């Protein structure tokens, strides 16, 4: 049951094949078994079981709230959850319990979803590996998959299997690991420059970033207000569409959401005709750093559309080379502004120094933020200095408009959907990932994803195939603004063609037992 899709489990609940409480208990048991993945910061066991009990009563009375009623979900720990600690994986917010739910969280709960817990991330969502949070790094479930382990055994130069685990990508790595390890059926991430799509690609999942303004940001602790979007992580496209149907729509608490009513639910056709589509391949995305395997799969995907009668053309996004630098300036500038609220006065951490208000501010922020966050604040403040404002921030805003116009021009030329890589390569081992600093890694990992956020477009990463190492590789589809349903329809067709092999639940469980046993043995040897 845990290996099924959200839609399948929803049908099973409606048919009485399993109860919400039984399903909840299965997921909670698996969360405990896979604790070593470090996917969750907080497990809301009591809350979930109470919600399951209420869901069970509704099913017995024939009053189901819909497809999400009784479905276990997880939420990234930068979304406010009433009565449940919300930390952003930072010392600054340790112990902070919000008095309200983020709009997207409330919408899921209103549909009867069961909140299993809050998932791990890079501190304040600043990173691309889920390695920089105060609660420690997240381990990719594929590190313990049969596919990856068998490939590693064939490599005589492989290092110790237990220490050479893989990153999930980030910053929504905890949400990706939670779904990939079958502890829930869907999870909320956030996506500012690729933070939902990147871990989806590394964990073999569907990672969907909606159009900016389609889904409310109220209650999402902000990183970059003009780019942040709640993201959705699921095991298949249909499931992402179900969750989107619950989340999309106007919100009076978020002035950036569209005011027009949204056509819901987002039903995707079982059979789609792609023969009339025009697929665009951005030539600027063929970068030297792109791995040969990803490049090959990208080319095969284009051929697949062509073989079905679709028109595949090369397009140009001429300002792509400026996008990473532009993104860095705008991102850090907004970070500097947003992080100013954490001053030790209203909520969150406060230091013991009381010599002066200024000294208290400085010490609080020094103790509360890690080096990555402080570094981005410093960069942003530099760009916002009076003497730098015009040369950096204003110029970056102008370049952002040029980047957005590149996409508009591509779509106006007749292109329906753009097809690109999501990441440069498959997931890398943690020990290799941390050889480079956060800033360098983020610039590399966001290369194909951040421009979409600056343009406000919908995008989805779809798992395509396993690499020669037995690891997932994803490709990205980018659509026109507010054509999210069309984008997901194309993605569903593609998903059906590639038939991506998921991790088998039993294989993961066997490895969980082995890892837990190794940890116990290590603990015993340390005590001796």
Curated annotation (Swiss-Prot):
UniProt-reported outcome of changing residue 117 to E: In COXPD40; highly decreased glutaminyl-tRNAGln biosynthesis via transamidation
One Gene Ontology cellular component annotation held by this UniProt entry: mitochondrion
Annotated spans, Disordered: 148-167
One GO process term, biological-process aspect: regulation of protein stability
GO molecular function terms listed in the Swiss-Prot or TrEMBL record: ATP binding; glutaminyl-tRNA synthase (glutamine-hydrolyzing) activity
Family to which this protein belongs: Belongs to the amidase family. GatA subfamily.
UniProt protein name: Glutamyl-tRNA(Gln) amidotransferase subunit A, mitochondrial
């Amino acid at each position: 049951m845990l290996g099924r899709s959200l839609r399948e489990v929803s049908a099973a609940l409606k048919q009485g094949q399993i109860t919400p409480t039984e399903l909840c208990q299965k997921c909670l048991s698996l969360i405990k078994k896979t604790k070593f993945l470090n996917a969750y910061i907080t497990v809301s066991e009591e809350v979930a079981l109470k919600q399951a009990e209420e869901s069970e009563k509704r099913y017995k009375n024939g009053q189901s709230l819909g497809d999400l009623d009784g479905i276990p979900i997880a939420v990234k720990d930068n979304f406010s959850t009433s009565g449940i600690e919300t930390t952003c994986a930072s010392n600054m917010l340790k112990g902070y319990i919000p008095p309200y739910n983020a709009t997207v969280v409330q919408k899921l709960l209103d549909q009867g979803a069961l909140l299993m817990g809050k998932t791990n991330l890079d501190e304040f969502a600043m990173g691309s590996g889920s390695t920089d949070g105060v609660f420690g790094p997240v381990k990719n479930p594929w590190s313990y998959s049969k596919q990856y382990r068998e490939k590693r055994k064939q490599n005589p130069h492989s290092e110790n299997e237990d220490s050479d685990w893989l990153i999930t990508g980030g910053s929504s790595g905890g949400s990706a690991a939670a779904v990939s390890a079958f502890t829930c059926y869907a999870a909320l991430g956030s996506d500012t420059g690729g933070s939902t799509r990147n871990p989806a690609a590394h964990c073999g999942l569907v990672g969907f970033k909606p159009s900016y303004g389609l889904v409310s940001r109220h209650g999402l602790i902000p990183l970059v207000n003009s780019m942040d979007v709640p993201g959705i992580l699921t095991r298949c496209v249909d499931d992402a569409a179900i969750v989107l149907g619950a989340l999309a729509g106007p919100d009076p608490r978020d002035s950036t959401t569209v005011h027009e009513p949204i056509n819901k639910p987002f039903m995707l056709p079982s059979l789609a005709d792609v023969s009339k589509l025009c697929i665009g391949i951005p030539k600027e995305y063929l970068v030297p750093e792109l791995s040969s395997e990803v490049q090959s799969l990208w080319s095969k995907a284009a051929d697949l559309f062509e073989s079905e009668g679709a028109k595949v053309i090369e397009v140009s996004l001429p300002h792509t080379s400026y996008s990473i630098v532009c993104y860095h300036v705008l991102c850090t500038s907004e970070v500097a502004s947003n992080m100013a609220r954490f001053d030790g006065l209203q909520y969150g951490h406060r230091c013991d120094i009381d010599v002066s208000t200024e000294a208290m501010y400085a010490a609080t922020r020094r103790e509360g933020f890690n080096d990555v966050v402080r570094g981005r604040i410093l960069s942003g403040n530099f760009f916002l200095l009076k003497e730098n404002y015009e040369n950096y921030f204003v110029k970056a805003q102008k370049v952002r408009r040029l980047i957005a116009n590149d996409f508009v021009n591509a779509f106006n030329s007749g292109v329906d959907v753009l097809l690109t890589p999501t990441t440069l390569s498959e997931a890398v081992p943690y020990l290799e990932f941390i050889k480079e600093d956060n800033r360098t890694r983020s610039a590399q990992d966001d290369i194909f994803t951040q421009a979409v956020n600056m343009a406000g477009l919908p995008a989805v990463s779809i798992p395509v195939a396993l690499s020669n190492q037995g690891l997932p590789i994803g490709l990205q589809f980018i659509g026109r603004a507010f054509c999210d349903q069309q984008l997901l329809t194309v993605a569903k067709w593609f998903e059906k063609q590639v038939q991506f092999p998921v991790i088998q639940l039993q294989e993961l469980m066997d490895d969980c037992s082995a890892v837990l046993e190794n940890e116990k043995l290590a603990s015993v040897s340390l005590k001796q």
